[in-house]
UniProtKB/Swiss-Prot annotation:
Record region (Glycoside hydrolase 36 domain): 306-570
Secretion signal span: 1-26
Protein name: A type blood alpha-D-galactosamine galactosaminidase
pH dependence, record text: Optimum pH is 6.5.
EC main group: hydrolase
Any GO molecular function: alpha-galactosidase activity
Highest rank taxon of the organism: Bacteria
Note: DNA was isolated from a male human fecal sample of AB+ blood type, the sequence was given to UniProtKB by the submitters.
Region (Not required for activity on soluble substrates): 699-1078
Practical uses of the protein: 5 ug/ml of this enzyme pair converts A blood type to O blood type in an hour, and can be removed by centrifugation, showing the pair can be used for production of universal type donor blood.
Length: 1078
């Protein structure tokens, strides 16, 4: 096992870091006998606060160390200095010339030490100067600057690679934070596990350019800590911070675009910060943020954040474009009662982007209508926000028609559209306003003043804060086309300053939909969004990242979705909601809004350095509020959820104080009398546990109930079925004062329950014996109850059972055994919804719909339309209905009607994700209902609809049965060949290479699936169900095994037959699965 390398340093050893007097040259190598074996003799070294850097002149490598107390922890392997890329190859033939060390300098981060390394390439003649600076102030940070001098001829470089660091001490896994903005975070998740035990090779480019704004930072870390590398620039520029898996670790580096280095000239290629840190990415990002402060990129101070930035918010986007002024005003009483203090008027209020004029269809009386809305909001004690898109000048706008000189022009002289991440387009995005055109920025300021002074809004939600295309407009006199991209934040700065001039307490949010935020926009906002996360764990991890970059006090929002509530509250996020809530959804919202309003963790101090994501047993977050520590532990959606129930450790408490641990969601004590220096306890939870540590001066007398959340069933309960001879026993030490015992061999008791856990409580005594315990007719263990007399003992428990009906049976095998009580954790069986695929003939389509395909869809296909008013309709008999669709930035909005009544507008626009529950309505009366999905704006789509059929009893749980290709139940016709490989389900498969060969299987169930291969030499098969042709399946494609090739659901109850016929060889069968009700 490779552990951390930790070596003690004496004072005399530390003094060895002071290699030479100030401004000395041609420095002698370091001599560090106290660290023999770690620091090689002859290496050069500099040190700063929490960091040490050594340079091996012979190997031309840099090694980073983290100092901890009086010791060193090696963080990087000896890593090469970066080089120029010429002709597709990195130049690496540099020879050492000199290494100069200054022990006391004033550098970019103030006082520290500096090392200057000079070397020359034999093949190109380039002289490289590599400068490293440490800081006495910023912990763990190293500043690096690189320059090149050309010799007698020009040198054309396509790319410059700066610092490169390979992590030291990795074992089975590394975690990587990736701030690049080249694509939506659904696919380019910011936090990824690099599994060193698999055969894959992790690689992320992490780009920032004219199509991708980003956090220009990457981090790799293990349990001992990690290394962060980020761009050290006061303005945005093109930069990559790639992370690449190596043979036994991973490396992080930085690079910038190439240039032509003219003969005899010197160019600076780029500057960067590296941070060595303990813990996870939070510490790395915080170190980067602190270093960037020295470059003038400074985040808002706590005093600059208005109270409204911490308020609970509701947004009109839940109605899409179908809102009206009166509809919003009519909602205010309800929202005020729920504790909402902020209202956002979202998209749909304006005529054209760029003009940002009130839409007369929404505001027939113009500004007076806008004031009617904002006045009503203010009368309810709320603030009013207005949605817009900064930098967007529109396409059909008056602004573009009258002032085309304000706009970015591409290389062909055409107006350039604002890009989506990675360089795509979006129908809602217009032409880009150039930040170097004075009139362009003035137009943004004019809008801000109009919205605040004439319409009464208190702040703004800026959306689509992605990147800015390069500008070739000759009227702007750009130093280079990249200047428009590099200066994009000027629009944000000037707009924000105009907001503050109108109201010092103005609210301003900028949102990078689905990508990391533009780092250079951060100083100009008072709240930051987690930006369209697609899972709860993405929400939590982004909160932690932005708290590191903005400050522990800075308000961060979660997304508007009910499953986000526990993640928002526990991480100290600001809750926002957009839906027109009713029924159980409204009750859930009011519950969590009430909890959030009580604890107010969004106003607390986020503490991000106590737990390491990916290495502590649970995904954990901590917020301190008014002197009380709040902890949030999560398993739902986590990338590394533990097995079982590890002990929970509360870090950061006062070691000299005693605490009671309270689950503040359910108002229950989960542990008590814990000292801060050993605050460890154990409790069971499913998705999350949110607790606070309450200081107590005296120990609590009452123990914590271990059966909290369990239902107790006494020995006399009629649900218990006794067989054989049993006797009643009465004693105050028993639960309810009674128990039942037997000394008859094979006497038994049976108890059936619906739940996920079961416990048997009884006695131990010297005359007691043994009992067999059966669970669902399977012998689990033999319990020995013989021992010192004790009542109320948990003699057996089974936890984490499937949510289903179970039976426990206790059989006496020797001596005496007794039953005091059972305790079980109840579960409500999820009702079984009947699914109706988009291609089902049960769905009626009106208008122009087209079929399209994706393996992630329910049945591999969906329907879409962009025709105005086109609709899809399903009639069903049931008590609940759900509608599933794909989300994408290419989709718009749709109206949902239920039994002819408009009930909701759904938003399909957003972070790319398939199989999304877009609409749900429960509690319908039994009988026939009709759901209709109607196109409202842009493209819409439908994956499937599910409904809960009428039923008197819950549908039994479904069971999935797997049938291997070699199973005797399968009937093969024609020539089939056996295939053996460990990639197959059971190591075997069968394939047909002749047309007409078939395989048939009879089953009883409601769903059937065929799994097999795709390959470039495979062909086509026809699938029949109950002798009726269903689908032709094309299995030709890129090689892949274990693919779901065919699926048929919604089969009526009963026996069915599937037949697969080879039309064009080759086809294969790995296995079938079918679903039946147990």
């Amino acid at each position: 096992m490779r552990g951390k390398k930790f070596i003690s340093l004496t004072l005399s050893t530390m003094l060895c870091l002071q290699l030479l007097p100030t401004a000395s040259f041609a420095a002698a190598p370091a001599t560090d006998t106290g660290n023999a074996g770690l620091i090689a003799e002859g290496d050069y070294a500099i040190a700063g606060n929490g960091v040490r850097v050594t340079y091996d002149a012979d190997g031309q490598t840099i090694t980073l160390y983290r100092t901890e107390g009086s010791g060193l922890i090696q963080m990087s392997k000896p890593s090469p200095l970066g080089g120029p890329v010429i002709g597709g190859q990195e130049v690496q033939d540099f020879s050492h010339i000199s290494c100069d060390v200054e022990q006391s300098t004033s550098g970019v981060m103030g006082s520290g030490q500096r090392m200057t390394i000079t070397s020359q390439s034999m093949s190109t003649g380039l002289i490289r100067t590599y400068v490293l600076e440490t800081s006495d102030i910023e912990e763990g940070v190293v500043y690096t600057a690189t320059s090149y001098e050309a010799g007698a001829s020009d040198v054309e470089v396509s790319w410059f690679i700066g610092s490169v660091y390979e992590l030291y001490g990795a074992e089975d896994r590394i975690w990587s934070y990736n701030g690049g903005g080249e694509g939506p975070m659904h696919y380019y998740d910011t936090l990824q596990k690099i599994d060193l035990t698999d055969s894959g090779k992790f690689s992320r480019e992490n780009k920032q350019d004219d199509t991708a704004a980003s956090i220009p930072v990457s981090d790799i870390y293990i349990a001992d800590g990690g290394i962060t590398v980020g761009d050290a620039s006061a303005t945005r520029r093109e930069v990559h911070t790639p992370v690449q898996e190596t043979s036994d670790s991973a490396q992080v580096s930085i690079g910038w675009p190439g240039k032509v280095i003219a003969a005899g000239s010197v160019i600076e290629i780029g500057e960067s910060f590296a941070v060595v840190h303990p813990g996870d990415y939070y510490n790395g990002l915080r170190g980067y943020k602190n270093a960037m402060d020295h470059l003038g990129v400074i985040m808002p101070a706590p005093g600059d954040i208005p109270d409204s930035s911490y308020d609970l918010r509701w947004e009109s986007w839940g109605w899409g474009f179908n809102w009206t002024i009166d509809l919003i005003i009519g909602k205010l009483d309800e929202l005020q009662a729920a504790g909402v203090k902020q209202i956002t008027l979202d998209d749909g209020w304006y005529t054209n982007a760029g003009d940002w004029a009130l839409n007369p269809e929404k505001f027939p009386n113009g500004a007076s209508d806008a004031l009617r809305l904002t006045d009503a909001i203010h009368e309810h004690g709320m603030t009013a926000l207005l949605w817009w898109r900064p930098c967007d000048g529109g396409i059909d706008s008056i602004l573009y028609q009258q002032h085309p000189e304000y706009f970015v022009m591409d290389a062909d002289g055409r107006p350039a559209r604002l890009p989506t991440p990675g360089g795509g387009t979006n129908p809602s995005l217009g032409y880009a306003l150039c930040p170097m055109a004075d009139g362009a920025i003035a137009s943004q300021v004019d809008f801000v003043n109009r919205a605040m002074n004439d319409w009464g809004f208190d702040g703004f939600k800026g959306d689509y804060v992605w990147s800015m295309p390069e500008c070739y407009n000759p009227a702007h006199n750009h130093a280079s086309p990249e200047e428009s991209t590099e200066k994009q934040s000027e629009i944000y700065r000037v707009s924000y300053e105009a907001m503050v001039a109108n109201d010092p307490n103005v609210f301003n949010l900028l949102c990078n939909c689905g990508t990391p935020q533009d780092y250079y926009s951060l100083p100009y906002m008072t709240q930051i969004a987690t930006a369209d996360p697609t899972s709860v764990d993405q929400t939590r991890r982004r909160v932690k990242a932005y708290k590191a970059l903005m400050g522990d006090y800075f308000p961060v929002t979660a997304d508007h979705n009910n499953i986000w509530y526990p993640s928002a509250v526990g991480t100290g996020s600001v809750l926002i909601e957009k839906r027109d809530l009713s029924g159980t959804a409204k009750e859930e919202y009011e519950k969590w809004l009430g909890i959030a309003d009580t604890v107010q963790l969004q106003k607390g101090r986020f503490i991000g350095d106590l737990y390491s994501y990916g290495f502590d047993p649970y995904e954990t977050y901590v917020v301190e509020k008014d002197g009380v520590m709040y902890y949030a532990f999560y398993k739902d959606g986590s990338k590394y959820s533990p097995t079982g129930y590890p002990d929970i450790e509360l870090k950061g408490l006062d070691p000299n104080k005693m605490y009671r641990i309270v689950d503040y969601v359910n108002d229950r004590v989960v542990a008590t009398n814990l000292m801060g220096d050993n605050a460890v306890f154990n409790t069971r939870f499913s998705d999350y546990l949110l607790v606070k540590a309450v200081e107590i001066s005296e120990p609590d007398p009452e123990p914590v109930d271990p059966d909290y959340g369990f239902t107790s069933v006494d020995d006399r309960d009629e649900a218990l079925i006794y067989t054989g001879t049993w006797h009643d026993d009465n004693n105050a030490s028993f639960s309810e004062g009674t128990a039942r015992y037997t000394n008859s061999t094979d006497a038994s008791v049976v108890f059936s329950f619906t739940g996920t856990s079961i416990r048997w409580y009884g006695q131990r005594d010297t005359n007691f014996g043994t009992a067999e315990v059966y669970l669902d007719d399977e012998l689990k263990t033999t319990v020995d109850a013989n021992g010192a007399a004790e009542a109320g003992v948990c003699l057996f428990e089974a936890l984490d059972l499937p949510a289903a009906e179970h039976t426990i049976k206790i059989v006496c095998k020797s001596g005496v055994i007794d039953i005091d009580r059972f305790a079980y954790e109840a579960a409500t069986l999820e009702p079984i919804y009947e699914k109706v695929d988009a291609l089902s003939d049960r769905i009626t389509y009106v208008g122009n719909w087209e079929e399209y395909h994706n393996s992630e869809f329910y049945m591999g296909n969906a329907m879409r339309t962009d025709e105005a008013g086109a609709y899809a309709e399903l009639t069903f008999r049931g008590t609940a209905v759900r509608l599933y669709a794909e989300m994408s930035f290419n989709f718009g909005t749709a109206d949902v009607y239920l039994d002819g009544e408009l009930v909701e507008n759904i938003i399909l626009y957003g972070q790319e994700a398939t199989g999304q529950l877009m609409f749900e309505r429960t509690g319908l009366e039994e009988g026939e209902h009709t759901i209709r999905l109607v196109q409202n704006a842009w493209n819409i789509n439908l994956d499937y609809i599910s409904y809960l059929p009428e039923q008197d009893q819950p549908t039994p749980p479904e069971t999935t049965v797997t049938v291997d290709a070699m199973d005797a139940q399968l009937v093969y016709t024609g020539v089939w060949n056996d295939d053996y490989h460990d990639v197959f389900q059971e190591g075997t498969a069968r394939y047909a290479s002749s047309a007409g060969a078939s395989v048939e299987f009879e089953f009883t169930g409601s769903e059937i699936r065929w799994y097999g291969q795709n390959d470039s030499n495979f062909g086509v098969a026809s699938v029949y169900i109950d002798n009726e042709f269903v689908q032709q399946v094309n299995v030709n494609g890129a090689a892949a095994v274990g693919k779901l090739l065919f699926q048929k659901a919604d089969l009526p109850a009963g026996s069915h037959t599937i037949r697969i016929v080879c039309d064009t060889p080759v086809i294969d069968l790995d296995y079938l699965t079918y679903t039946t009700n147990a």
